[in-house]
């Protein structure tokens, strides 16, 4: 719904000509790190707060004042836009520090494009050069700092499908990953729990919006969408500094670059776009620190590709990305975001699974017809939601119908089939381009390589979670024992492992050698030597008679683990002739 608030916009700019960023405070309160910002506009004042919860694995006291001032000030610069938009003042006065001309251009661009939807739905006509100007009370410009960061990762979790795909792929590839959540809720915590991540292991920011802003919204002051992902970007720098982690891996896909309104540079997802990501990386490197590596891990992928990967994970019943139902932690089933999620997953999940996840078959709900047409590109704009491209939506629907022709009788799919473009998409059977990683991204080469082996990495993530809580002993150090050790060190590089063998010469050689196994504890295979072990990984060279002391429930093997992971994908081939030929043929077919 487009409102005509252009008159109100002009009146408020005249009545409230200057918005002030007075300053900020921060400190440790009851063990947590708190920061409060002070904004003023006329008779109105706002004091939004962030509380970073104390955790055992990091410290708030390792950063000096210069580092904290720099990071906190910049969080305030993005926080203020949520309050400025109520008045749209002509000037923003920054009282404690100054910005050079390039910094001003950076912030003006974020504010203008990040508020593109806000201006559009309020019927406000303005341009990037005239909508706001900066003024300063002081001349000091904060200098960039160096930070002592390690080669480890942070993955922000939003509760939807994208962030858990990033989490599992990076985790399965052996990366040291911590999750980060702003204002934890059911879905975000459930996704972490499903990944065997406890609440104590999560980086948390409790962000509080000043209640007076909500009062102004109710009174009719200007209101609308703000660039939350830009807030996440600047806040993530703080938790990265606190936890000494260099890499901040967002989960914004290539589809986020598409404009929401045809013919206009208005993008609901601007702060998820590659343009914003590149601008942010440049700004951080020059004005904050070159030590941070902020990037979107899923940037090379389409929504369809992500949905396909997600369908192979075990988060279907805990993920939720419905904004309308977020407070109740549900899929509302009545909004464009729910319909898009249903559509994009429909080629990859069975109908009964989708009904269990969303509470109903959304393709049968005629009340969603308008949203369907908007998502498919019928009309001047897509819904103002984080949804995929028009092309992806149409390809997903066509894939669903080809996979299940009977579904064409469902109300929304019947409607889609009557659109003039439907035949084109149904005839387009070559969709490989939707599942080919793109080259325009900021990933490190080692992280980009993960997509070439995504399925095996997903299975490695499952295996890692299956074994991460165990104290493991590998029984036997022949060929299979060494391959087991290499696999476990690949997926769990910091796990303490034990290798046991009945050959004392093998044990003694490895106990004294300075080789790649120097982090492994080697022991002689005998009873009473493994009281702390919870899982024994047996190899073929160790006879059962030699390990009678091992309880059966604690015993496993490579074959056992393989079948636990791949039982649904295993085809057994036997016979005296043609096994290798048949195997090769089946491999090519399936």
Regions found by a protein language model. Name each.
Residues 184-186, 479, 503-506:
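Helix N-cap at the beta1-alpha1 junction of Rossmann-like dinucleotide-binding domains, i.e.
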């Amino acid at each position: 719904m487009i409102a005509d608030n252009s008159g109100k916009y002009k009146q408020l700019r005249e009545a409230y000509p200057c918005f002030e960023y007075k300053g900020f405070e921060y400190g440790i309160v009851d063990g947590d790190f708190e920061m409060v910002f002070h904004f003023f506009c006329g008779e109105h004042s706002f004091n939004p707060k962030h509380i970073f919860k104390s955790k055992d694995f990091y410290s708030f006291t390792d950063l000096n004042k210069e580092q904290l001032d720099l990071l906190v000030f910049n969080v305030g610069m993005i926080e203020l836009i949520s309050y400025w938009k109520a008045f749209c003042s002509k000037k923003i006065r920054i009282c404690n520090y100054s910005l050079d001309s390039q910094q001003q251009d950076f912030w003006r661009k974020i504010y203008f494009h990040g508020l593109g939807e806000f201006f559009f739905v309020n019927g406000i006509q303005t341009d990037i050069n005239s909508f706001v100007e900066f003024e300063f009370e002081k001349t000091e410009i904060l200098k960039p700092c160096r930070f002592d960061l390690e080669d480890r990762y942070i993955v922000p979790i939003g509760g939807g499908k994208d962030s858990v795909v990033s989490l599992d792929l990076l985790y399965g590839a052996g990366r040291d990953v911590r999750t980060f959540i702003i204002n934890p809720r059911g879905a975000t915590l459930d996704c972490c729990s499903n990944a065997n991540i406890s609440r104590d292991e999560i980086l948390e920011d409790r962000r509080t919006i000043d209640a007076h802003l909500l009062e102004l919204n109710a009174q009719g002051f200007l209101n609308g969408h703000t660039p939350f992902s830009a807030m996440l970007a600047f806040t993530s720098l703080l938790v990265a500094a606190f936890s000494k982690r260099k890499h901040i891996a967002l989960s914004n896909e290539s589809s986020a670059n598409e404009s929401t309104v045809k013919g206009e540079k208005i993008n609901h997802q601007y702060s998820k776009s590659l343009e914003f990501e590149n601008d942010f990386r440049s700004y951080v490197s020059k004005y904050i620190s070159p030590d941070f590596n902020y990037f979107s891990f899923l940037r090379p992928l389409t929504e369809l590709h992500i949905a396909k990967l997600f369908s192979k994970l075990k988060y279907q019943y805990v993920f939720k990305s419905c904004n309308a139902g977020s407070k109740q932690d549900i899929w509302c089933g009545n909004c464009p975001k729910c319909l898009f999620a249903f559509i994009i997953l429909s080629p990859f999940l069975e109908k009964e699974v989708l009904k269990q996840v969303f509470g109903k078959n959304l393709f049968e709900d005629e009340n969603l017809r308008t949203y369907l047409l908007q998502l498919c590109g019928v009309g001047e704009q897509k819904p103002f939601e984080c949804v995929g491209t028009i092309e992806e939506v149409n390809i997903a629907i066509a894939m669903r119908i080809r996979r299940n022709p009977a579904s064409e009788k469902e109300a929304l799919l019947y409607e889609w089939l009557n659109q003039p473009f439907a035949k084109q998409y149904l005839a387009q059977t070559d969709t490989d381009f939707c599942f080919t990683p793109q080259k325009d991204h900021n990933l490190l080469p080692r992280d980009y390589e993960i997509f070439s082996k995504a399925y095996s990495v997903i299975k490695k993530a499952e295996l890692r979670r299956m074994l991460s809580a165990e104290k493991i002993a590998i029984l036997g150090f022949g060929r299979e024992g060494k391959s087991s050790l290499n696999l476990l060190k690949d997926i769990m590089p910091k796990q303490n492992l034990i290798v046991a063998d009945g050959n004392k010469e093998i044990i003694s050689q490895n106990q004294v050698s300075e080789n790649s196994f120097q982090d492994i504890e080697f022991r002689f295979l005998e009873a009473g030597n493994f009281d702390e072990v919870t899982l024994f990984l047996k190899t073929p060279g160790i006879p059962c008679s030699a390990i009678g002391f091992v309880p059966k429930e604690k015993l496993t093997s490579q074959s056992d683990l393989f079948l636990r992971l791949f039982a649904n994908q295993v085809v057994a081939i036997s016979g005296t002739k043609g096994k290798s030929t048949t195997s090769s043929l089946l491999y090519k077919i399936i």
